[in-house]
Amino acid sequence: MDWGMKNRLARIIRPKTGRTLMFAVDHGYFMGPTSGLEKLDETVKPLLPYADSLMLTRGALRYYVTAETDVPIILRVSGGTSILNKQLLHEGITVSMEDALRLNVSAVAFSIMVGAEYERDTLLAFTQTVDKAERYGIPTLAVTA
């Protein structure tokens, strides 16, 4: 593991305890407006001091999190359909590693649908994401659903 990967992981996982408290607010990308998260900036900001990292989508990061935020960002890079489509679990890559780098994220997150109809598709897209992220020293988090 290279220095960049170690450094990014050390931002997310407390080196002294090996633990982390991740605040995930990426639900709106497929669930639509989520009760309590309609005003994401107002909801998230007071909770940031208690979080070791914040997982969210590219749009939420750009529009609701200030650049002065020092909480490590885990960027959701998978998606596809919304609750309006019966193929909700058919996800793919939605954000490039170049965008992740431009946004200065500490890690990326990708949903894999274990046991679902599209399990193979999500696993293959996940491995592509891992390969691309490793080129830049960016950790990849598998989110199981």
Language-model regions: role of each:
Residues 56-57, 106-112, 138-145:
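Short beta-strand segments at enzyme active-site cores
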Residues 47-48, 101, 134:
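Non-catalytic positions within long, well-ordered alpha-helices that form the structural scaffold/packing
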Residues 1-75:
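Conserved N-terminal beta1-alpha1 strand-loop-helix module at the mouth
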Residues 6, 133, 140:
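Expand to "…catalyze enediolate/carbanion chemistry for C-C bond making/breaking, isomerization
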Residues 24-38, 76-94, 115-119, 144-145:
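Active-site mouth loops of central-metabolism enzymes
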Residues 57-73, 88-93, 114-137:
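Active-site-adjacent beta->alpha loops and helix N-cap segments on the catalytic face
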Residues 96-117:
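Active-site gating/metal-coordination segments in enzymes
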